[in-house]
């Protein structure tokens, strides 16, 4: 009997070994500053079926995340966050398994799409529970702004909170925090008096028709244009976390302004990636074809009386104070710092500030461009409280963005 058991286990060993693959990843910080929560992304295309993963550093388990970017039930990328000292090099061991489920870790990001629950009248404004993760409206829909409870998909890290309006503006509206924590699941952008008394944040920016924080739009030769007309407009959540959330805004059949006569309609996907521990948000702009003959725009709202900063190389920011609502009796004035960082190769011109916006006119060579947005609220106990502090932070932030860690894979 014992001999048979031994032979059975021996026969199973090759299968067990085959079921997992190990990768060694070295991460080097070339900068003379300590860096926290640095995203490390591993493309899984070459590793066959991956159902679960384990990341360790010196034998200690590190939280990781598997993402199915195209929603075909296959994981495309693995993500983990590295804390690395100045000039330090660390090695991480990744074990990939072709069975099981992704390991659970505490959530450090959150994303939500929700419709109002009109049946249960007892629910408060911040207790709505008709959760969805994909919504499409026809281009001739009369009024999509109020279709979702908080007007569009929202997402957050411990440091920030953003919602994207589900209409032709597609503006990023901002939630300011006092404490470094996740809040949107509880407040849904509608913080009640009890939550405010406990130190929860709230909406801190009135955006109107402006860019808000880095909305991506067209350019008609004289001014920014909203994303219309379109055949359909969609929002969806690709990933809920726990280390990064990914949401997409998809415009199909957009008749965008172009530099040629009779341009054809284009499809555009705006992918927003929010990493834990980050106040900045990555924006990927993806098209279904080359858009060399089109012009686009982005920028930030000119907050009333704001002070401007520009390094004339793609980093543009402001610091200002205004009411976050037209109801000036209910709301107090809020001070915010905003910024957008655009690659120089995509900039056609940096336009002078007007009463609404600090604007960049953009071009896209090929089918994709990427940029970043970031902000702070002066309410933060962990943030920045003057224009000088904010602008100094942004200069250091840009250096980190342009000096990535060095990642090497060893199979």
Where are these regions (language model features)?
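Primarily extracytoplasmic ectodomains and periplasmic/lumenal surface modules that are beta-strand-rich
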Residues: 31-35, 46-51, 101, 155-156, ...
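Acidic (Asp/Glu-rich), glycine- and aromatic
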Residues: 268, 274, 279-313
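Bacterial Sec-dependent N-terminal signal peptides
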Residues: 1-24
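Extended, loop-rich substrate-binding clefts of extracytoplasmic carbohydrate-active enzymes
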Residues: 195-275
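Beta-strand-rich recognition/accessory modules
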Residues: 70-84, 338-411
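Alpha-mannosidase-like glycoside hydrolase catalytic domains involved in N-glycan trimming
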Residues: 20-127, 134, 138-143, 150
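Polysaccharide-binding surfaces and accessory modules of carbohydrate-active proteins
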Residues: 21-27, 295-347
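Solvent-exposed N-terminal domain segments of exported/luminal and surface proteins
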Residues: 100-227
